[in-house]
């Protein structure tokens, strides 16, 4: 029978794709940050998405010489669409770059619509079997049918698949997707795959080891997945891959769900004057049973959805409760919000340094004039608490009592980027190497918000004062007070009131209230120009007849083939001119007038780590002011001396589908 029957379709809707992933960073070898090995690793991993998808789902290569040589491999599950494969490989590569900070080996098996694998090392592993590291994840649900019978069917299915995967005569070596029936309405779905650079013998060994892990990891569970560096094996009681829709399955040996109907021609039963055909009886009973079954299935679906919703809500409540601090504890930590504890002020309130449970923290006390309600405040806390990335400031907790709304963040000792960048006496502490590292770190942080986190998050207020610096001058993006969350099918939104900081906001946002991930890209471009020139984005270049803002000034220098005139004099003597020029080029691509012309953060990241990536010519930026007369300059001077204004209006947002 074909697997496109009614029950698997309902089961697929009920269960959906389970999100599984695993990763491992090596523990024996390490490289020096910003070394040639790190550069080679970034270049090679950035090349994998396009190469793997273009070569049928598998690609391996190496780059560099001697101890700086990096070997890498990427593989997608057989049959994956090229664009889906590319997205998964890109996600895996970025995952390794963000988590394996200085390890010379790394392995990631993420699932992003499909299952894929990326692996890198400082020694060649191509064509070699590596059984370790291995890890597994099992389904949380137990088997409810006969376990002995399940094991027998499962073992026969695994044996058959290994034979198919490693047979020299097989049409699809190194891969198998197959099914086996437990009952009329319960089917085991399984998939296994080796890296195709292995010998068939090594593939057989790898898969046998993975099958052998069943007793250890997943006995009695409805499903599981075993990852190894050279192969993967997964099974479930639901169709977790599109590959299963193309597989035919013979009817199970068990008794059918309904008894076989006897052959009835004109047989009838008489009672009084009523004559009832047995065929009519069956014609009534069978449809009734089917209808009842479907109704029960639909009710089960509704209960499942409500339970999932309840579980999600409960999880959020648990997270919120575990993060909540008592107001008295906050008062004590800040010496009753003493002026001497203030380390910053912003549009939403003041930031205090404090000590909670023996740990230094930054405590942000929102202004009582803030219109953000308690419910929205809690939602923001739950969302930010789930963000975990080395280039994002970590939220430790909150306090919500009466009119008090307080956020508790990790303490970042070196204050914010603007503290160093715009102070002539401190600019020298940021040499080009540090500035380039800050640009790279901000890129990774925004990429996580836009693409790699569970939700797509638009920051909407990227600026130098919202980039904090840790003890090693690594950047951490802060202040999510204006952030907006996009759903899976949302690519943009409109707002009737503007929130953000002048100079960093793109034209489509200021004029029409439209914002998207490309709004953050525009702000990022302005920020990069500030980092390079060491001056604020407000009007910085003045002559006897003209005043230009930063974007206009950078564009004019670019058009005049003199972009390096933009560079901060404190670093101009000791900077990599090619890197600086490339960063200016990328920044100008980010501030282009048309949002669709601006690159995505994943593309920007690739532009930064892969110098062979050809950059397109930038178009005229948004807010291009060619000449501002001398008569207007006095007013601009006063604006230049003032602090940048952040507009904190309440927003009314309409979302647009992709």
UniProtKB/Swiss-Prot annotation:
Ranges where the Gnk2-homologous domain occurs: 23-125, 131-240
Residues carrying a glycan: 51, 60, 102, 122, 146
Gene3D superfamilies: Gnk2 domain, C-X8-C-X2-C motif, Phosphorylase Kinase, domain 1, Transferase(Phosphotransferase) domain 1
UniProt keywords, alphabetically: ATP-binding, Glycoprotein, Kinase, Membrane, Nucleotide-binding, Phosphoprotein, Receptor, Repeat, Serine/threonine-protein kinase, Signal, Transferase, Transmembrane, Transmembrane helix
Stretches in topological domain Cytoplasmic: 299-658
Catalytic activity field: L-seryl-[protein] + ATP = O-phospho-L-seryl-[protein] + ADP + H(+); L-threonyl-[protein] + ATP = O-phospho-L-threonyl-[protein] + ADP + H(+)
Membrane-topology descriptor: Single-pass membrane protein
Primary location group: membrane
Keyword Cell inner membrane carried by entry: no
Pfam family, one: Pkinase
Active site, per annotation: 461 (proton acceptor)
Segments forming domain Protein kinase: 337-614
Phosphotyrosine: residues bearing it: 409, 509
Topology, Extracellular side: 23-277
Entry-annotated residues carrying Phosphothreonine: 501
GO function terms (MF aspect): ATP binding; protein serine kinase activity; protein serine/threonine kinase activity
The enzyme's E.C. designation: 2.7.11.-
Similarity annotation: Belongs to the protein kinase superfamily. Ser/Thr protein kinase family. CRK subfamily.
Protein name: Cysteine-rich receptor-like protein kinase 14
Organism: Arabidopsis thaliana
């Amino acid at each position: 029978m074909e697997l496109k029957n009614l029950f698997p379709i309902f089961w697929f809707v009920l269960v959906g794709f389970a999100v599984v992933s695993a990763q491992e960073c090596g523990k024996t070898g390490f490289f020096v940050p910003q070394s040639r090995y790190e550069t080679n690793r970034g270049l090679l991993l950035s090349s994998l998405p396009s190469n793997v998808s273009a070569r049928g789902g598998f690609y391996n290569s190496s780059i560099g010489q001697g101890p700086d040589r990096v070997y890498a491999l990427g593989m997608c599950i057989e049959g994956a669409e090229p664009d889906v494969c590319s997205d998964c490989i890109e996600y895996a590569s970025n995952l390794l770059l963000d988590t394996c900070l200085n390890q010379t080996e790394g392995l990631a098996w993420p699932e992003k619509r499909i299952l894929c694998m990326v692996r890198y090392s400082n020694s060649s592993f191509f064509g070699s079997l590596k059984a370790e590291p291995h890890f597994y994840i099992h389904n949380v649900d137990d088997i409810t049918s006969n376990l002995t019978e399940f094991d027998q069917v499962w073992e026969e299915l695994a044996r058959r698949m290994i034979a198919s995967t490693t047979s020299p005569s097989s049409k699809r070596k190194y891969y198998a997707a197959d099914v086996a029936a437990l009952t009329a309405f319960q089917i085991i779905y399984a998939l296994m795959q080796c890296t195709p650079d292995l010998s068939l013998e090594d593939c057989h060994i790898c898969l046998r080891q993975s099958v052998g892990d069943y007793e250890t990891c997943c006995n009695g569970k409805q499903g599981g997945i075993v990852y190894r560096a050279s192969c993967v094996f997964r099974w479930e009681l639901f169709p977790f891959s599109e590959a299963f829709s193309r597989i035919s399955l013979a009817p199970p040996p068990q008794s059918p769900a309904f008894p076989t109907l006897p052959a009835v021609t004109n047989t009838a039963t008489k009672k009084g004057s009523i004559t009832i055909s047995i065929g009519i009886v069956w014609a009534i009973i069978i449809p009734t049973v089917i209808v009842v079954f479907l109704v029960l299935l639909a009710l089960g679906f509704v209960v499942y959805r409500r339970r999932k919703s309840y579980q999600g809500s409960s999880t959020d409540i648990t997270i919120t409760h575990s993060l909540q601090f008592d107001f008295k504890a906050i008062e004590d930590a800040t010496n009753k919000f003493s002026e001497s504890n203030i380390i910053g002020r912003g549009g939403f309130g003041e930031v205090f340094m404090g000590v909670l449970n023996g740990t230094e923290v930054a405590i942000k006390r929102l202004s009582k004039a803030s219109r953000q309600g308690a419910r929205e405040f809690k939602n923001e806390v739950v969302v930010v608490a789930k963000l975990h990335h080395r280039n994002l400031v970590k939220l430790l907790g909150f306090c919500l009592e009466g009119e008090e709304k307080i956020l508790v963040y990790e303490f970042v000792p070196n204050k914010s980027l603007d503290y160093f960048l715009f102070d002539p006496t401190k600019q020298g502490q940021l040499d080009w190497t540090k500035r380039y590292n800050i640009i790279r770190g901000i890129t990774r942080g925004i990429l996580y918000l836009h693409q790699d986190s569970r939700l797509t998050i638009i920051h909407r207020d990227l600026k130098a004062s919202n980039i904090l610096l840790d003890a090693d001058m690594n950047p951490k993006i802060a202040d999510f007070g204006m952030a907006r969350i996009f759903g899976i099918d949302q690519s943009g939104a409109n707002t009737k009131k503007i929130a953000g900081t002048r100079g960093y906001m793109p034209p489509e946002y200021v004029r029409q209230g439209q914002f998207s991930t490309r709004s953050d890209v525009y702000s990022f471009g302005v920020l990069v120009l500030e980092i390079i020139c060491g001056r604020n984005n407000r009007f910085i270049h003045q002559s006897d007849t003209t005043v230009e803002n930063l974007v206009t000034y950078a564009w004019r220098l670019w058009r005049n083939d003199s972009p390096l005139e933009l560079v901060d004099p404190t670093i101009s003597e000791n900077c990599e001119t090619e890197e600086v020029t490339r960063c200016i080029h990328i920044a100008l691509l980010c501030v282009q007038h048309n949002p669709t012309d601006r690159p995505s953060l994943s593309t920007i990241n690739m532009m930064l780590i892969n110098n062979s990536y050809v950059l397109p010519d930038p178009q005229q930026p948004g807010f291009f002011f060619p000449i501002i007369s001398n008569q207007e300059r006095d007013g601009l001077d006063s604006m230049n001396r003032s602090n940048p204004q952040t507009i904190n209006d309440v927003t009314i947002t309409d979302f647009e589908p992709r």
